[in-house]
Amino acid sequence: MSPPEPPRRTRRALRRRQSNARLWLVIGSALTGLSFAHATLAAGKLPQGGTYVAGAGAIASHGDGLVVTQPGSTRGVIEWNSFSIGRNNSVTFDNGSGATLNRVTGGSPSAIFGRLSATGSLYVINPQGIVVGPSGVISTGGRFVVSTLDVCNDAFMQGGGSLTLSGDRDASVINLGKVSSSGGDVFLIARRAVINAGTITAPNGTAELAAGEQVLLQDSGSSRQVFVQMGGQGTVVNRGHIKAAQVSLQAADGNVYALAGGGTRIRATGTADRDGHVWLVADGGRVSQLGKISASNADGSGGTVDTQAAQLAFGKHAAVHAGQWNLSTPDFTIDDSVAHALQRSLNAGTSIDVTTTGANGATGDLGVASSLSWSGPASLTLAAYHDVSVATGTTIANSGAGNLTLRADAAGIDNGDSVINNGTIDWSRSTGIVRALHDITGGYLPGNIHSNSTWSAPPDSGLVTQVTVYALVNTVSDLGAVGLNPSGNYALGRDIDATPPPGEFSPAVASFSGQFDGMGHTISHLWLSGSLLGDIGYSGVVRNLNIEGSAANFPESATWAGLLADTNYGTIASVHSSGSVTSIGPLSTGIGPLSTGGLVGLNGGTITRSSSTADVSSYYAAGGLVGTNSFGVVRESFASGDVTSTHYQGAGGLVGYNFGVITESYATGTVHVQPQCDTVNACGGGLVGGTSGTISQSFATGKIDQPSGPAGGPGGIADYNANYSASSPGTITGDVYWDTQTTGATVGVRTTLLGATLGDAKGLTTMQMSTPSSFGPTYDFGPGGVWAMPVGATHPILQWQLAQ
């Protein structure tokens, strides 16, 4: 009879002890393999038998030192019989800003217990292994690479952006000393094991520990520079200290160990042109994080840590202090040890994204089996390739402003996946939001959810409820299915290429009254016979969406036309359109759309932080963003497409006709009005064709092109200002501007109607438009303000555009 299985916690402890035992066995065997080299260092020792085999330079011995001189920024390759440095010895490479590759061809490993320095870049390659002893000090001005893998001389001498190293020798690279590069990277590379138990510093570069049979080095200032091919099953261990702009530990199909100890063992600090980034990668193996990792950018903001492996393990001191921590693994269960690591990191202000991939035949499920609670603004995303589940008796809670996202089908492939909550989600003390996303053919089990009764949506977010459940839209077919339940909540699970078969794609929805969150994704190559969502009702919300395509052939019965919607009476937030919208003139059975916009035809709701670069052409009125703003609000939005009205009505760069409110917005597209523009028919305006509403803190810069016109020429802001009703008087405030040079307009408003005034808009030159002080006190260009003036810009842009 077999003995009873120990409890789960005991089994985890046994696995940790076994894992630690294997780790120390790896370290011990690696050190043992190089121990004989240490024994030979009683007397001083210098590299022996060096000869240039590519490039040119001089090698000279001076007592306890050796100096290699290589002129200018050249490259060179030296082959050595041995390359070791005794405790009281030094080797100096005076190689300017060039690079020198040192290859050891003898049969002994390299042991560096003295000083090794270079003005430029330095490569040391020894297939027998390399150890930097406790007294060893290495410093370079450029990149330092120490490797048991070899590289082709010709490839090295050519330079360029990439270099491949390969080898099959079971040797290790070990650092017990101090290795630094003041201006470049530090790379430690081996097939069997790379161990850092000393100090590595690269304030302006990347510190990389990589184990594998083949490694690609690639120059990059913003992403990973080293890529390890599967094979070798090597081990990377850090039990020392690493501080660099970026840090990477990779073992491909081996194991990565980030060990614990005093303080932060791995710290990425970033530079002006490199974000602070840490990578822990073992796609076919295991990453074990036992200590604290820190990543920050040069400006003090939080950096990024990416952890990806077939298996993930965390010790009792594991934590990440950064802006973002991304974890990726085939499937995952958040048990006690994981929950503690995530909780410590979330409380430190680190937002976390855990994603399962379903790789290696795994289920791709993501389960929460241990409770998680934290305070503060950090957010947690749990995204599963298959299902997400919260176990019975488990609680996820936040007190602060943190968000929680539970997403099934993270790959967006319509697996029919579900979000299952058998536990409790407590956001009663949080001002953040909770989102659950499942496939249209999947399901949702709500469990116990506690929301905050005093919650209110952040300004301009387009949010409606604190806790929202969405069905994922991953395909064109899913998009069409929205029409079956137009009052539901939907979210784009991925970018959708809507390239049509022969014929046009009919509108997805005739009338939409639910929530549609694009999640920042794009629907591209739309070819619409009408708008995408038809009419957006009073309770309808569309947010965080990009759409690209063309809309034409609107029904003869259509009164309004736009790429996103014919009419909007709800809320549109952070939606951006590109492409073209075309509506033609009188038809056999109807007059066709009266007003056409790049985003919507008629706006009676709210549009905020949105834009259109679509070209708009209409027989009647046309606007770059909105055809007619009918008692609606357009705020913090812009349009830059060309706008054309081919007959009878006017056109505006942002809005055709305004009867509502336009504020903190602008237009830069060319406005064409043809052929009728006279004292009877409306002409073009840089911002609006005509207005009987309110315009404030807005401007226009686009050329106004009208072949004929009445005296006074085009209006830089509007063709006319009118008082059509007491509830809609025409008001143009003094913080409205137009560029007198680019628009070709000498007046802001051409004419007035029904007792309105010309308003207080002001003309500025292009140079004045590029100077923040020209816009007066109402334009806020400060941190957190509405406006920004990028270097070299000829006009302001909206602050939110900087984040795109």
Language-model features: locations:
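Extracellular and secretory-pathway beta-repeat/beta-biased strand scaffolds
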Residues: S2-Y470, V476, A481-L484, I523
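Surface-exposed repetitive/solenoidal architectures
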Residues: D331-Q804
